[in-house]
């Protein structure tokens, strides 16, 4: 099952071809943060170490097919006798008659390939997280600016109310209502300021920094353009996902381990040759007149309490489980792509209607402001219109962030990552 039967819903004609997540977005300072995260992120470095351990395991498995050379030297001295020194060299080799060692190397190689793909998947996910975190900081800055503008309007309303009161056109109750709105907005400003600091700390952790103030964050306040990635053939898009590749290599490794488990039941052939010598001094024992021996040995397991059969069952179940893990990974991949495509459509529609509502709210705010000055509406009506206008403005920002973040998710679902 590789995704050939998957049918994607149509996507926007504005989608663009890209080969990496960084191709989707271009903004000041972002690439530097991505490079820093790939170099210093603690979680990614742990995944890299796991990959290196898997690569070392290949050498360990391959070493079983090499000659083993052992050297020994000993000396003894007993009462009423001369000292005796013995030296020896032994060369041994296991004949890989059944390709058991070869299968072990194959399994280790596929394990390393799976670890390499898992590392690549971690790199892709990290880049996506850095981009989303960067966009989140910009979002919180914009929301803070909206609240600050809301506060400015409310404070201006307080001044207007005082002027009207002094001329006998209003009451102090109106002023209390305006001050209530101002105080509530100040609380929101404090919240957004804290949210910005928290978002910067989140990005700093991704970058692997101890100093989490992120004082070098660019003075960017506008969203960058984030392209919608172009969906090609489903099997091509899903095939480049590293998590699917990792799951596939895990299957191949488990299949090789099943072969190793079965071949453990077969006889093994070992060849060894040795040289030994002894003497009353160390120099005399260093092969001045050595004896040699040659040994061929065949061993076969007869009874081990069912351990070997249990190992076979375990290997087969592990292999079966890896197939189900691959299927689960594939189905999740299909769902992620389809969800992102549906979200793109929904966000586009929501933005369209929210923009209409925002324009209407601006017109209403202007109308109600004039009517309030004429005494046709009270302050509660005016503040309600202002609230609606600013809330819609904030909603537009949040929708835009959600759409841009969703495009990053779509790129990640399609296997876009970062260049090597």
Positions of PLM-derived features:
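Acidic, low-complexity, intrinsically disordered peripheral segments
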Residues: 225, 374, 395-420
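Periplasmic alpha-helical coiled-coil/stalk elements that build and connect Gram-negative outer-membrane
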Residues: 101, 117-233, 343, 347, ...
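Small/polar (Gly/Ser/Thr/Ala-rich) solvent-exposed segments
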Residues: 45, 65-84, 92-121, 245, ...
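Alpha-helical hairpins and coiled-coil heptad-repeat segments
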Residues: 158-175, 364-382
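Transmembrane beta-barrel architecture of outer-membrane proteins
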Residues: 32, 84-86, 132, 177, ...
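Terminal intrinsically disordered/low-complexity segments used for targeting and assembly
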Residues: 1-36, 193-239, 412-420
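Membrane-embedded beta-strand positions in outer-membrane beta-barrel channels/transporters
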Residues: 34, 88-90, 134, 234, ...
